[in-house]
Amino acid sequence: MEINLNGRTALITGGSLGLGFAMAKALSEAGSNVIIVARNEKNLEAAHQELEAKKSGDIFSYRCDVQDANEIDNLFNHISKDIGPVDILINNAGRSAAKPFNLISDEEWRDDIDLKLMAAIRLSRLVWEDMKQKKWGRIINLLNVYAKAPGAETAPTSVTRAAGMALTKVLSAEGASHNILVNAMLIGFIESDQIKRRYEASGSNDSLETFIREAGSHLPMGRMGTAEECANLALFLASDNASYITGCAINMDGGLSKVP
């Protein structure tokens, strides 16, 4: 199946590492202009250079802390001036945060909500009118499998991601008549920078490869997924091949979830 995104412009938050970078690479290779956004300038520059070397569409990068509403506004002022309307928005920024409920402070709740929910709300609002006018738009929200089936000690992530799933349904309902298609990808255990951070925090004496292999062996498919596999799904959802798919929350977890 050939996917052609020539002439489209995609904005990907958390685009310098892991899933975000893999999605940026896939969309760029399909012809899309790609804007990557991240907080860490060093990682952002490295990602930009790597994407430039293999690009099909144009590559842009902006440092932005999407937890900050003012920085988001400044980001969009630059994008509007330098590039123009965004056709594809991938809300990918986020990091795993989970601990016993009674140990989560108000500040930790606010930080998680700002990063994982409010950033998606603000960015979606900023791209919405241009998508309506063009009668074409794609918004993809990267969530977590706990959005559907939260367990003990999965907050605050499970709570904010569940809210992100509700946001996906609201936006898909409002966008359908304007051909703005909004879907969510619920991510399970994927080989990524977050898994690397979990490995480093574990104090394991095993190699990273052994850690990943051992953790993946307990999953239904016997392995973790890859960032490239996630990127393939995002690429499909961003394309005209997914022209009748909206309002879906798709598990990307190798069969881990008990809730479809």
Regions flagged by a language model, labelled:
Residues 4, 149, 235, 246-260:
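Short C-terminal tail/terminal secondary-structure segment
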Residues 9, 16-18:
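Conserved glycine-rich cofactor-binding loop
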Residues 100-101, 108-113, 211, 215:
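Substrate-binding pocket helix/loop in short-chain dehydrogenase/reductase
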Residues 104, 150-158, 170, 198:
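Active-site loop-to-helix junction immediately N-terminal to the catalytic Tyr of the SDR YXXXK motif
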Residues 124, 160-161, 168:
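Active-site helix of classical SDR
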Residues 129, 173-174, 243:
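Alpha-helical segment proximal to the catalytic Tyr-Lys
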Residues 176, 181, 245-247:
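Short, small/polar-rich loop/turn modules that mediate ligand/substrate recognition or access, typified
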